[in-house]
């Protein structure tokens, strides 16, 4: 299954590792390269560096072709 995860923080990273272990094809979008680097070293993912809310990053990740899209970005009040 093709999964796109929007956000590589604590929750996004945990979900990514679980989904990769289950054999899913996971793409992760995050604006912080260091988060993507850390996650890439722990799991076989396709990292996309960019604003998780931008149309460009979502297009680069082919979010429209994903079987599952998960957004785990922080809540800002």
Where do the model's predicted regions map?
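Cytosolic regulatory regions of ion transport systems
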Residues: 1-77
């Amino acid at each position: 299954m093709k999964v796109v995860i929007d956000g590589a923080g604590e929750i996004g990273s945990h979900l990514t590792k679980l989904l990769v272990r289950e054999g899913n094809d996971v793409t992760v979008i995050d604006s912080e390269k260091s988060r993507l680097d850390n996650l890439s070293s722990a799991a076989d993912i396709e990292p996309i560096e960019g604003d998780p809310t931008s149309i460009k990053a979502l297009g680069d990740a082919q979010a429209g072709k994903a079987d599952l899209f998960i957004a785990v970005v922080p809540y800002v009040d």
